[in-house]
Curated annotation (Swiss-Prot):
PANTHER family: PHOTOSYSTEM II D2 PROTEIN, PHOTOSYSTEM II PROTEIN D1. It is found in: Cellular thylakoid membrane. Chlorophyll a PD1 binds at H198. A quinone binds at H215, S264, F265. The gene is psbA2. Pheophytin a binds at Y126. This is Photosystem II protein D1 2. It comes from Nostoc sp. (strain PCC 7120 / SAG 25.82 / UTEX 2576). The record marks Y161 as: Tyrosine radical intermediate.
Amino acid sequence: MTATLQQRKSANVWEQFCEWITSTNNRLYIGWFGVLMIPTLLAATTCFIIAFIAAPPVDIDGIREPVAGSLIYGNNIISGAVVPSSNAIGLHFYPIWEAASLDEWLYNGGPYQLVIFHFLTGVFCYLGREWELSYRLGMRPWICLAFSAPVAAATAVFLIYPIGQGSFSDGMPLGISGTFNFMIVFQAEHNILMHPFHMLGVAGVFGGSLFSAMHGSLVTSSLVRETTENESQNYGYKFGQEEETYNIVAAHGYFGRLIFQYASFNNSRQLHFFLAAWPVIGIWFTALGVSTMAFNLNGFNFNQSIIDSQGRVINTWADIINRANLGMEVMHERNAHNFPLDLAAGEVAPVAISAPAING
């Protein structure tokens, strides 16, 4: 018996590196998008953690009134945030080397730009990496398409909205209460709750939660029995098994009788496409709505829409919302504005019909 050994062709270092980067046998797939994703997300995460803990107050409004956002300046997990860069910086790109000193960079909120630019680059690459891994494995490319919804939402609040408003100080703060403040001010200035695209987003998120719960409960309730009463029903499934683990006919029959026949899917592929598409399309619309409101194409305004025969206003819920919006608007940036923009931009009201004569 003769044994033959075939020597593998020796590849150069670059080819070995390329093979390792694109290998689907690694525990975690890297990919070419991962080459950029890993350092950018690490930079964003590191800067965020340091800034959240120790960043000095930031002059967010550009009026020399710094706002503290870090833990060591008295905040907690709920109130803390990485404060957006100063209104004095506006839309200027503000890396560390553009500042005269590190203290100036911190005072003007430089860490915020560092975090959001690296974060957005990282999530864009994560989306590309999802497509890349699907391509390597011969899968269809819809996973990255689904992830494009939260990517679009993040891009809208961190990039498109500040561009439309003319300053990164209008971007969403990187913290819990800062996010709520952003939402309240957004409602006050843009009436987002009355925007149809936001309504579609609410339907997408709440509807997606409802459909997910309905699907999960129907599947769990129609599992094919494979275990005894004394065992966990989870032991009835073996990873990779060819048989269906639940009875879709039973689930279809139950739901069709609970609502009506055509409210229930009888095709598993159509069902799962619907479960993916509903929330994704809804969040797409919300991101599109925020991106249009960034340029002040705001929600519907039905203020003082109903009047009686004498011309007197009959208040509706739209007028209640308008009053709430004005209240929220006068509370934010209280030292940067004398009046809310809606009041300051109105026509000048005369305070006297004629000036009195002055006899000296």
